[in-house]
């Protein structure tokens, strides 16, 4: 019994190590992105901040899908219910992509309006306008990462999650 408890603790810390390193990769990319924007001047830093805020709003909603993925994937995987796991993952992707398309539409229709809610500086909003399409497509491009993050954590298969994040970080810097 002691060995099984010890093995469970070791697995717990290995999973958390992978999540910690994944989060560290995300922080490194965000730090670099902010630093690169700052080196281009105050205007570009302000533009990046506005556009990243749109991503942050979307990410709060998508974290709900990630949390659901963690809980439900873990539940069905732990119970050995492959059908329940399959249905859960399929539903997460269906509803996740639906929400991503909704956010993309909202950002495309009301993008500059949202930017004006975040700042009263018209020059910053105008400088952000050419980059707004990138922010509009982030939900559709990023939804898979949020859902898989939750599923990988729920399955305690965090090595694959860490590997994909490291590869994405490497590609970002290339």
Q: Regions from the language model: what does each represent?
A:
Residues 1-16, 20, 73-138:
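Short alpha-helical transmembrane segments in multi-pass integral membrane proteins
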Residues 47-109, 143-156, 160-164:
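Small-residue-rich hydrophobic transmembrane alpha-helices
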Residues 17, 29, 33, 69, ...:
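Hydrophobic/aromatic residues in alpha-helical transmembrane segments
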Residues 27-57, 75-76, 113-122:
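Helix-terminus/linker motif at the lipid-water interface of multi-pass membrane proteins
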Residues 4-32, 37, 57, 61, ...:
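Hydrophobic faces of transmembrane alpha-helices in multi-pass small-molecule transporters and flippases
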Residues 1, 126, 159, 169-174:
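Membrane-interface helix-loop junctions in multi-pass transport and translocation proteins
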Residues 25, 29, 33, 37, ...:
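Alpha-helical membrane-inserting segments
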Residues 53-54, 133, 166-173:
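Small-residue-enriched core segments of transmembrane alpha-helices in multipass membrane transport
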């Amino acid at each position: 019994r002691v060995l099984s408890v010890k093995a469970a603790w070791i697995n717990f810390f290995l999973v958390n190590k992978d999540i910690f390193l994944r989060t560290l990769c995300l922080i490194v990319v965000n730090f670099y992105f902010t630093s690169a924007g700052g080196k281009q001047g105050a205007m570009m830093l302000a533009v990046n901040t506005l556009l990243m805020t749109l991503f942050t709003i979307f990410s709060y909603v998508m974290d709900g899908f990630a949390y659901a993925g963690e809980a439900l994937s873990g539940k069905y995987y732990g119970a050995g219910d492959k059908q329940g796991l399959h249905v859960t993952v399929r539903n997460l992707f269906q509803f996740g992509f639906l929400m991503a398309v909704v956010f993309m539409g909202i950002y495309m229709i009301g993008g500059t309006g949202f930017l004006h809610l975040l700042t009263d500086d018209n020059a910053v909003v105008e400088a952000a306008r050419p980059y707004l399409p990138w922010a509009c497509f982030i939900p559709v491009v990023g939804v898979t990462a949020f859902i898989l993050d939750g599923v990988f954590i729920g399955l305690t298969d965090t090595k694959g999650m860490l590997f994909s994040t490291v590869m994405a970080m490497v590609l970002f810097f290339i």
